[in-house]
């Protein structure tokens, strides 16, 4: 499923399981099937692993976004979170205007955290995380910028060296929504980013307080509802290859 790779760092590559996990939720083929198994992955390394986490710079993120756009990515998954950055905002705005759908993890800093970026950027589909009972994942960020929610607690993911593990976080809920978006574009390739966001909101299963809220946005993303939504104009019938998805992974 890997259509291309890009390393924005000048250091020697160190394997990081976060990117493998994200890609597996989108397009895995094996005991674990991704939500969009026909998707072609553009794997990007923009973050330098440091102990348990990873560190990124504005320059490396911008290089990675530019590369993904140049490769024809239709969806960019951004499973990372940090402070607002004007340069990254301009890059995201340009990408959306080119027709690229941008999906980002809300963050795992909890209820008291301010909005984190790029999820809080207006050009982005922001995804919070739910648990097995459709309750908000305790560590998930909240905010009026949340578009939809998706499962993100105790998720089975692939890791390097043919392994699997259970892991939690909004990174995984964002990946699941990126897979849904890839399927939407497979069915209707001419969907715009704004239309994709509108469909996700309109077809989501309402959770929490009635109507949109700061925890779940419009509600739990509904893959079937989003893919089968009545959209005009509808693409010609027939199986189409899923457009390229950049994982934006570490």
Identify the residue ranges that each predicted region occupies.
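Short loop segments at secondary-structure junctions
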Residues: 29-31, 130, 152-154
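Structural detector of well-ordered beta-strand residues that form the stable sheet scaffold
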Residues: 42, 101-104, 125-127, 149, ...
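Substrate-binding/access-modulating region of protease and related hydrolase catalytic domains
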Residues: 46-123, 131-138, 142, 160-174, ...
